[in-house]
Amino acid sequence: MSLKLDGKKLSLEIEERLNNYISSNKKIAKRAPGLAVIRIGEDPASGVYVNNKEKACSRIGIKSFIFHLKDSVEQKEVEQLIIKLNSDKDIDGILLQLPIPKKFDEQKLISSINPGKDVDGLNEINIGKLVKNEPAMRSCTPAGIINLLRSQNITIEGKKIVVIGRSLLVGKPLSLMLLNLNGTVTMTHSKTLNLNKVCREADILIAAAGKPNLVDSTFVKEGAVIIDVGIHRLKSSNKNQTRLCGDVLLEDVISKVFAYTPVPGGVGPMTVTMLLVNTIFSWQKQFGLSSTLNDLLP
């Protein structure tokens, strides 16, 4: 039977440890950690994600500040808000909820976030430090994936790892993080020739293509570990209902794989948990608190 990498269960376990960590250090810091989330526009999925982050913060004692801006707001106004939050001593982390309306210069906004408060790890300073394998904020989804693998003692070093997707949010930082952990990494994308053949070489296959049910049994070798980053809402056979699926056609591959992540309940919860970890890391650094935070992770 294949091993389910249960991100929801692991995230709750880590949250409990984080809650205890905050409680034991709050008297020294004299305040709770603070996370500012900037949402622009009315994208429904963004609303759900921001709500999930707000609830997660509340569960463990992080104070969240939600800034929901209309899509009529100007670039300069968003930049000014970020500058204000950069200097706000009650804010440890700043997150720009993506995607944002196309009229905005997304990278310029991300670049204006103080690297020490860039809890999404997307500022070029943090990306540069990742390239150099120096300590810095790490992107949440890649960090969540690595902790999921570690939680089940799945070795990265020396393994052939194929990543499908080259986004700045997942594919690129994840490939660098795996490389820094001595994995043998191949990054693939929409122009890769014979994609399923390349993927069949993988000991660990990570699907972050953003394409529903792309990965079937022809992509997977016996005994592989498969991580599904995708999440899509599709119409079910009953037209009035929808169902969630990932980039992996799970029912087609499950008999071949050693371990897999479900959708939902796999990578998603761990992404939110690593956002909490990054926020607390920034809080810890500001107040010179106990450096045992890494001991709370797998």
From Swiss-Prot:
<dbReference type="GO" id="GO:0004477">
    <property type="term" value="F:methenyltetrahydrofolate cyclohydrolase activity"/>
</dbReference>
<dbReference type="Pfam" id="PF00763">
    <property type="entry name" value="THF_DHG_CYH"/>
</dbReference>
<dbReference type="Pfam" id="PF02882">
    <property type="entry name" value="THF_DHG_CYH_C"/>
</dbReference>
<comment type="similarity">
    <text>Belongs to the tetrahydrofolate dehydrogenase/cyclohydrolase family.</text>
</comment>
<dbReference type="InterPro" id="IPR000672">
    <property type="entry name" value="THF_DH/CycHdrlase"/>
</dbReference>
<dbReference type="GO" id="GO:0006164">
    <property type="term" value="P:purine nucleotide biosynthetic process"/>
</dbReference>
<keyword id="KW-0378">Hydrolase</keyword>
<keyword id="KW-0521">NADP</keyword>
<keyword id="KW-0560">Oxidoreductase</keyword>
<dbReference type="GO" id="GO:0035999">
    <property type="term" value="P:tetrahydrofolate interconversion"/>
</dbReference>
<feature type="binding site">
    <location>
        <position position="190"/>
    </location>
    <ligand>
        <name>NADP(+)</name>
    </ligand>
</feature>
<keyword id="KW-0486">Methionine biosynthesis</keyword>
<dbReference type="InterPro" id="IPR020631">
    <property type="entry name" value="THF_DH/CycHdrlase_NAD-bd_dom"/>
</dbReference>
<dbReference type="GO" id="GO:0004488">
    <property type="term" value="F:methylenetetrahydrofolate dehydrogenase (NADP+) activity"/>
</dbReference>
<dbReference type="InterPro" id="IPR020867">
    <property type="entry name" value="THF_DH/CycHdrlase_CS"/>
</dbReference>
<dbReference type="InterPro" id="IPR020630">
    <property type="entry name" value="THF_DH/CycHdrlase_cat_dom"/>
</dbReference>
<dbReference type="GO" id="GO:0009086">
    <property type="term" value="P:methionine biosynthetic process"/>
</dbReference>
<keyword id="KW-0658">Purine biosynthesis</keyword>
<dbReference type="InterPro" id="IPR046346">
    <property type="entry name" value="Aminoacid_DH-like_N_sf"/>
</dbReference>
<feature type="binding site">
    <location>
        <begin position="165"/>
        <end position="167"/>
    </location>
    <ligand>
        <name>NADP(+)</name>
    </ligand>
</feature>
<comment type="subunit">
    <text>Homodimer.</text>
</comment>
<dbReference type="GO" id="GO:0000105">
    <property type="term" value="P:L-histidine biosynthetic process"/>
</dbReference>
<comment type="function">
    <text>Catalyzes the oxidation of 5,10-methylenetetrahydrofolate to 5,10-methenyltetrahydrofolate and then the hydrolysis of 5,10-methenyltetrahydrofolate to 10-formyltetrahydrofolate.</text>
</comment>
<feature type="binding site">
    <location>
        <position position="231"/>
    </location>
    <ligand>
        <name>NADP(+)</name>
    </ligand>
</feature>
<comment type="pathway">
    <text>One-carbon metabolism; tetrahydrofolate interconversion.</text>
</comment>
<keyword id="KW-0028">Amino-acid biosynthesis</keyword>
<dbReference type="InterPro" id="IPR036291">
    <property type="entry name" value="NAD(P)-bd_dom_sf"/>
</dbReference>
<dbReference type="GO" id="GO:0005829">
    <property type="term" value="C:cytosol"/>
</dbReference>
<protein>
    <recommendedName>
        <fullName>Bifunctional protein FolD</fullName>
        <ecNumber>1.5.1.5</ecNumber>
        <ecNumber>3.5.4.9</ecNumber>
    </recommendedName>
</protein>
<keyword id="KW-0511">Multifunctional enzyme</keyword>
<keyword id="KW-0368">Histidine biosynthesis</keyword>
<keyword id="KW-0554">One-carbon metabolism</keyword>
